[in-house]
């Protein structure tokens, strides 16, 4: 019944608090000692003092214990004893700030102002870098209305050159007292101790509030002179003071003063983007649009020149500088390029990014000379100067040699172009130059020169498979099959040293060449080499088999030759040659497939054997009949499960079961195998 009443009762915060309070553990109250007379009081005080002294004997460095001891004596109104304890504690560690603060607060609490003043004087003398003690001293004196003493304390404190907070506090005090001349004197010392931009700007704000235009301008001038005289002043501080100075002058309508200030500043610090941006914004707001762009561009040009004088290897700046000169100072562009070539020569003896960027700008200069100046002797001289700078024994730039040769070709000076390319190959052969020279001679149909160049190219880099293939293709296009065949043979010899992968590429092209030349027997021989070189790759077996169905038989060749003799051409004047797959082609293809199947069967490579059978099946689907297709389909392997015992553990595995292998077994073995499988099935 009681439970139901509780469930129906509303739960309130009051009920929750009462329940929590009732479950709260009761803490046993400490024994209270009632002191009835003076005798008992003195006895209790003696015992407490003994306890404190005993604890301090064990650990006299526990300053918090000293403070509790002294506070106890103050609570007992025994000021003499409390002072004695504080003094003893200060002898232990006079640098403990909370001890000084409690000592001073205790004296102030008992209105012992002179004693508190003496303590503050002692504390600030002993610890002049502790701002808290100074502020407490100042608070005490200012609350008593002793402005003269406060000013003296501030003066003494600032003689120690404290942080900005002390100076700001002194300035606020004098401002409250309306002693503005004293504030100016303080600022004059403040900026010497803390010559940062923030200090100067505080002084400026003060003069803007309590001074006149002349005083503000004087402070700005002093600030700018002082900050620029220090070599370690950050540029951002100088930018701030100049920006503030110029903005203030503009606000007073002194636009020429502001403009002159920006101009001198940009000339003095040309690398300052902030000053340039401020100057641009000023001109947009107060200047004329006619001269603003020219002023900005001139300043930017001077900035680039100053920067490149200090760092001539900054090629990105050179590029931008040349862009600017080309756009606005066209008459100075040639001298700018010449300065670049002379001043920005890379020092590195390796072909790094600095050389590439240097040559890129040189190429730009050469293009400019040819398209604009068109002074041929000057262009040749510049080409020669640039080529003389490059250490060709270490590296070279094929693009530059090719440009020089193309320039001479455009001047119809083919002999000079060949000489340039020859010098390039003699000093530092480059594949790019070889290819360009070869293509040039091919276009000129100077094939004897092309052959010599290919021989030099292969001699320079015999491991380049592409050079061998291009050389062979050249001879093939020229109709010299023997030369082409010889190049293929030499490239595959051991003396050349091509890698296996490159030899596979060569022999593949070699087969295509012999096929195009109708040398099918040679192509078959190459396929045999191809198989050996590829370690009897299954795909090459398949390709060889299919190859037999893509070439004509002897009968077809004879028919083609007779047709050729009879002059049987189509409408376009080309020879007709109709090719059909004959039973002979199919026979050769199937024979190679069977050879591949036997090879992989002999070497127990079931996966590859299956792949060959699958390819044979696809072939029969296209070129076979129903009978051959069914035979090949019947030879396809199936996946069977078998049990294998490994380390006395019977495991299941899967293998490919080829019908050809079953057919090859004798009848008795087949019967036994069938009976064993039937018994295994019945047992399971």
From Swiss-Prot:
One of its GO terms (biological process) is spliceosomal complex assembly. SUPFAM superfamilies: TPR-like. It is found in: Nucleus. Its main location: nucleus. One of its GO terms (cellular component) is precatalytic spliceosome. Involved in pre-mRNA splicing and cell cycle progression. Required for the spliceosome assembly and initiation of the DNA replication. Belongs to the crooked-neck family. Associated with the spliceosome. This is Pre-mRNA-splicing factor CLF1. The lineage of its organism: Eukaryota, Fungi, Dikarya, Ascomycota, Saccharomycotina.
């Amino acid at each position: 019944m009681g439970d139901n009443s509780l469930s129906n009762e509303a739960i309130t915060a009051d009920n929750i608090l009462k329940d929590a309070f009732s479950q709260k553990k009761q803490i046993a109250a400490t024994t209270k000692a009632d002191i009835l007379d003076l005798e008992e009081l003195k006895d209790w005080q003696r015992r407490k003092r003994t306890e404190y002294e005993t604890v301090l004997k064990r650990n006299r460095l526990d300053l918090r214990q000293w403070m509790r001891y002294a506070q106890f004596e103050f609570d007992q109104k025994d000021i003499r004893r409390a002072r004695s304890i504080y003094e003893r504690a200060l002898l232990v560690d006079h640098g403990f700030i909370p001890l000084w603060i409690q000592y001073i607060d205790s004296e102030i609490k008992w209105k012992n102002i002179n004693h508190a003043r003496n303590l503050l004087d002692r504390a600030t003398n002993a610890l002049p870098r502790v701002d808290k003690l100074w502020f407490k001293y100042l608070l005490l004196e200012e609350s008593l209305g002793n402005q003269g003493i406060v000013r003296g304390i501030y003066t003494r404190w600032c003689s120690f050159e404290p942080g900005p907070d002390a100076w700001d506090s002194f300035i606020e005090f004098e401002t409250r007292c309306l002693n503005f001349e004293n504030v100016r004197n303080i600022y004059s010392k403040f900026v010497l101790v803390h010559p940062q931009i923030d200090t100067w700007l505080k002084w400026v704000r003060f003069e803007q509030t309590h001074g006149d235009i002349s005083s503000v301008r004087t402070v700005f001038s002093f600030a700018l002179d002082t900050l620029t005289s220090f070599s370690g002043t950050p540029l951002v501080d100088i930018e701030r003071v100049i920006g503030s100075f110029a903005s203030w002058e503009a606000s007073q309508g002194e636009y020429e003063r502001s403009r002159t200030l920006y101009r001198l500043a940009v000339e003095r610090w040309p690398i300052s983007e902030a000053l340039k941006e401020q100057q641009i914004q000023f001109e947009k707001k107060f200047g004329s649009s006619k001269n603003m762009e020219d002023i900005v561009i001139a300043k930017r040009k001077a900035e680039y020149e100053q920067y490149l004088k200090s760092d001539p290897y900054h090629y990105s700046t050179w590029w931008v500088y040349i862009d600017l000169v080309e756009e606005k100072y066209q008459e100075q562009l040639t001298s700018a390029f010449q300065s670049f070539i002379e001043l920005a020569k890379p020092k590195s003896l390796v072909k790094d990014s600095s050389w590439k960027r240097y040559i890129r700008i040189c190429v730009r200069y050469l293009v400019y000379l040819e398209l604009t100046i068109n002074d041929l002797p000057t262009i040749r001289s510049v080409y020669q100067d640039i080529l003389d700078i490059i250490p060709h024994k270490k590296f070279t730039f094929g693009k530059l040699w090719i440009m020089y040769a193309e320039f001479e070709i455009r001047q119809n000076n083919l002999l000079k172009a060949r000489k340039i390319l020859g010098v390039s190959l003699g000093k530092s052969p480059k594949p790019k130059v070889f290819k360009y020279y070869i293509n040039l001679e091919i276009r000129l149909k100077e094939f004897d020169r092309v052959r010599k160049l290919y021989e030099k190219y292969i001699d320079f880099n015999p491991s380049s498979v592409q050079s061998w293939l291009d050389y062979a293709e050249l001879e093939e296009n020229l109709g010299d099959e023997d030369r082409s065949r010889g190049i293929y043979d030499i490239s595959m010899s051991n003396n050349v040293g091509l890698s296996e992968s490159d030899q596979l590429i060569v022999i593949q092209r070699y087969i295509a060449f012999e096929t195009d030349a109708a040398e099918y027997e040679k192509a078959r021989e190459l396929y045999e080499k191809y198989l050996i070189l590829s370690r009897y790759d299954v795909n090459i077996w398949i390709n060889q088999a299919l190859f037999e169905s893509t070439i004509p038989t002897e009968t077809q060749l004879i028919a083609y030759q007779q047709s050729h003799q009879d002059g049987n051409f189509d409408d376009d004047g080309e020879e007709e040659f109709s090719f059909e797959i004959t039973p002979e082609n199919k026979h050769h293809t199937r024979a190679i497939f069977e050879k591949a199947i036997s090879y992989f069967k002999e070497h127990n490579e079931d996966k590859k054997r299956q792949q060959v059978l699958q390819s044979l099946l696809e072939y029969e689907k296209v070129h076979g009949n129903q009978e051959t297709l069914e035979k090949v389909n019947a030879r396809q392997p199936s996946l069977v499960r078998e049990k294998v015992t490994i380390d006395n553990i019977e495991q299941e595995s899967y293998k490919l079961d080829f019908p050809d292998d079953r057919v090859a077994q004798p009848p008795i073995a087949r019967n036994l195998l069938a009976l064993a499988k039937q018994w295994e099935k019945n047992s399971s």
